[in-house]
Amino acid sequence: MWSQIPGTLMRTSSLPAVIEASGNDDWKKRKEAQSLKRLEVKKKRIERRNSLTCNTSKEAAGQSPEEMNANTDKLVSSDETIASANESHSSGKHLVKGLPPKYQATITSQDSSSAMRKKPNSAFKGTAITEEQNSSSSVPSSGEAISSVTAPSLPALSLVPITATLGSREDQSILGRAGARANGMGDVERRMMQEMPGVFTKGLSNGSRVEGFLYKYSKGEVRIVCICHGSFLTPSEFVEHAGAGKVDNPLRHIVVSATPNL
């Protein structure tokens, strides 16, 4: 049969109470040791910071006001030299902008050589000035270099079709002045002028005669270039340019000549 269960249970699996108390003591000791180490580390950091601040304050206090002013003047002068160097460098870039690489190299070398020529004694001033004039005359200016690079090597009258599409009188007058310089043109330009028929006004009320060149376009638009001003005009404007005013049919007063007007 079943035996009676005693009223109190005995501990069988857990550690004795003495061992548990000793384990708690060890854990407390470890915690205390860790906290002490942390405090020591914090103290060392604070001491280092204090020592650094003390050293910097001592150095600042040891300097006289004159030394401090001298240091500030050195810093300001160095900043000014850097700023002036940057400005001169940027201005040199703007001056050389738009030139081909070979002209850029010559101009930069000229600038450096001219800066070195300013240093010799007064005995060599005459030779330095003559050398500088010779070098400056050999190197083209920025405007001449730009015009020589950008100016096309096409005939003067090859710009005429471009002006017909522009429509503004200002551009037409600018290119018309280029066409007025046809006196010094070469054989190619003269051949082109011979292929273009010449025109002149006839039968006007004032009896004036104005000569020009006739140009035809694919859209049927007609433009006439007057010889006197080099302007690109329509038939009605060409008749008005002759001083006859507005007419009903301007083509009746314009005659195409067989020989070119050269």
Swiss-Prot record:
One of its GO terms (cellular component) is nucleus. Keywords: Nucleus. It comes from Zea mays. Disulfide bonds: none annotated. Residues 48-69 are annotated as: Disordered. InterPro entries: Ninja_fam, NLS_NINJA_AFP-like, TDBD. The keyword Nucleus applies. This is Ninja-family protein 3. It is found in: Nucleus. GO terms for biological process: negative regulation of DNA-templated transcription; signal transduction. The keyword 4Fe-4S does not apply. Belongs to the Ninja family.
